[in-house]
Amino acid sequence: MKIGLASLAVVLVLHFPQKSDQPVPVEEEPLHKVEFKNDAVTVMRLILPPGQYTQYHIHTHDRVAVQLSTTSTTQQDWKKPEGPANPVKPGDFAAMTLEGNSYTHRVHNVGKEPYEVIDIEFAQRPTAPSAELAAPVAAENPSSRIYHWVLAAGATAPMHKHVRPYVIVSVTTLNLQMNSPDGQTAARFVEAGSFRYVEVPPGGSFTHNLANIGGTPGQIIEVEMK
């Protein structure tokens, strides 16, 4: 049986995934933008327009996701059907544990608004995790713990101590003030979705609290390495 060139081209397209469909490391996925990276963590921001998919991408570390938008998404693991829609809103978070050597998937924004998320990936799991907690743990994986602060206007979180480096994420726009036990204060206006990596040297610590000195409610998430 003879097969024409046009028919052969169709067969090749159907049976061999195109280059754009092949998984890439998450840092190379076009919509995942690396905004901070050091030897300990990589912080990426994904903004996915409504109706669009990311490229299939590969995660090779434990990670934390902090949601910054109100929409719905689906997850599709490599070579598996697309999963159900999952609504998200600002302040939702998840601490994900890598099972095996890697995890490959893509994300589909099935909502009507852009999907924005901060993805924090940890270079390696600690050989000796810290047993000291800064606050009640909202979620954790083998590499990190999440502390979630919901601050009404004028509210102050309890004083707490970090003994490991951490990433502080502002879920909402607010006027934030940090106070230390010796009376020092530092205030700044932070925008929704902004973050900062805070270094805590081995054997050291950093004690502070968080105060919302503005007139609207705020949310802060601290992601502390173990």
Q: Each predicted region: which residue ranges?
A:
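Bacterial Sec-dependent signal peptides at the C-terminal "C-region" and cleavage site
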Residues: 2-25
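Glyoxalase I/VOC metalloenzyme domain signal
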Residues: 20, 101, 112-116, 120-127, ...
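A short glycine-rich, His/Asp/Glu-containing loop-to-beta-strand
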Residues: 29-55, 60-65, 131-168, 223
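Short acidic-glycine-tyrosine-enriched beta hairpin
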Residues: 36-40, 78-99, 183-202
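Glycine- and acidic-residue-biased ligand/ion/polar-headgroup-sensing regions
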Residues: 60-79, 163-182
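Surface-exposed beta-loop interaction hotspot
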Residues: 97-99, 104-153
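Asparagine-centered strand-capping/turn motif at beta-strand->loop junctions
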Residues: 106-111, 160, 208-214
